[in-house]
């Protein structure tokens, strides 16, 4: 059993290799996506203090008035400004609430950060982002398996990578966890016993310490692309299959001459149903004639995300203030589902904690790179010893 596990662990490590290192390292960088975006767009985030700042409704009107060809679809308070974004979430104008002036326009999917997001989140399938490969956007053959429906080649790559990371974590527990007789050896660091002992101990200790995060990233990462993984996890932990219609909202019919609610009206209605701050709001469209108000409460698992930091959605019929639907994972489902939605999945991104605490996520996100370096070091050392012994025998 030990040799079998060791063999398959080694093979999966080879397959993961650079893919795992690139995926994990890019993910570690993207933990600070919001902070890096704000730092690299200082003019965009310029804002002034005012006793009477403008609100989201006014910001939307300012942008649509000055840029009538811009398809404004949402508005979000972020970093002191009011961002008015496009319907395809690709760009946004920043409005200074203190002066009502437009600071400028930003490409939300461009640059180095956009490339990293496209690589890490989409496997180069995000439309309109740098590096997109059209070949990876095609669906994979289902081979009669319904759970593969709508899965692209890019999604399959990410899903398999997540599953392999999960297997690597499980096999790592089997290989690295010490017996009770030599418990202390599993966490020792022989820093003065030579290169091989040092790197071997670093490999083992860092590996076992990072296991909880690797398992979390593996499960949630695979589940993003392969929903069957989430269903399996929830079934094992006492939950139920996710409600696929949870975020569907069909506004009821109203009189054709019924007045349209304003952004301020929709925001006020949302606050009547949910305590918290408004993260962002999408405006009605011909295809979806309602407001969607994303809210963040005291516990905000996505609270440190740029623009889209809410975890509770309030749908408001744009012509009927009494036609409202609240989607909150804290209510109406088993505890296992709530834990997954409110803790487990958000932990993948680290947005539930501040940037200082996210240093822990960053350090553990770099472990695949460290494990590769220490693994190569011990392998090259053993290979060198074997060569010298062979030469001595000959």
List each model region and its residues.
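Conserved histidines in hydrophobic membrane contexts and catalytic metal-binding motifs
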Residues: 1-394
């Amino acid at each position: 059993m030990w040799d079998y596990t060791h063999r398959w662990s080694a093979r999966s490590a080879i397959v993961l290799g650079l893919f795992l290192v690139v995926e994990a390292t890019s993910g570690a960088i993207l933990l600070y996506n919001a902070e890096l975006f704000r730092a690299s767009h200082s003019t965009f985030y310029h804002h002034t203090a005012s006793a009477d700042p403008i609100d989201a409704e006014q910001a939307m009107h300012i942008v649509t008035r000055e840029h009538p060809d811009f398809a404004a679809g949402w508005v979000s308070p972020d970093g002191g400004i009011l961002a008015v974004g496009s319907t395809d979430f690709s760009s946004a104008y920043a409005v200074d609430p203190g002066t009502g002036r437009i600071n400028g326009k930003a490409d939300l999917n461009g640059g180095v950060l956009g490339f990293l997001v496209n690589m890490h989140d989409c496997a180069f399938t995000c439309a309109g982002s740098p590096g997109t490969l059209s070949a990876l956007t095609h669906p994979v053959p289902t081979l009669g398996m319904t759970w593969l429906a709508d899965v692209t080649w890019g999604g399959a790559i990410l899903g398999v990578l997540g599953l392999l990371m999960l297997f690597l974590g499980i096999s790592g527990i089997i290989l690295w966890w010490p017996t009770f007789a030599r418990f202390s050896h599993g966490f020792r660091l022989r820093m003065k016993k030579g290169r091989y002992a040092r790197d071997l101990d670093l490999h083992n200790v860092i590996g076992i310490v990072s296991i909880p995060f690797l398992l979390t990233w593996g499960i949630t990462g695979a589940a993003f692309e392969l929903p069957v993984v989430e269903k399996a996890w929830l079934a094992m932990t006492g939950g139920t299959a996710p409600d696929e219609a949870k975020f569907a909202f069909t506004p009821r019919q109203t009189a054709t001459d019924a007045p349209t609610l304003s952004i301020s009206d929709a925001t006020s209605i949302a606050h009547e149903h949910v305590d918290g701050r408004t993260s962002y709001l999408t405006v009605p469209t011909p295809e979806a004639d309602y407001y969607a108000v994303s809210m963040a409460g005291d516990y905000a698992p996505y609270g440190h995300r740029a623009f889209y930091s809410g975890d509770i959605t309030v749908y408001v019929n744009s012509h009927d203030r009494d036609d409202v639907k609240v989607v909150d994972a804290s209510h109406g489902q088993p505890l296992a589902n709530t834990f997954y939605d409110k803790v487990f999945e958000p932990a993948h991104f680290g947005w539930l904690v501040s940037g200082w605490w996210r240093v822990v996520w960053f350090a553990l996100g770099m472990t695949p790179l460290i494990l590769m370096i220490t693994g190569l070091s011990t392998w090259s050392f053993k290979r060198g010893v074997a060569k010298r012994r062979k030469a001595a025998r000959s």
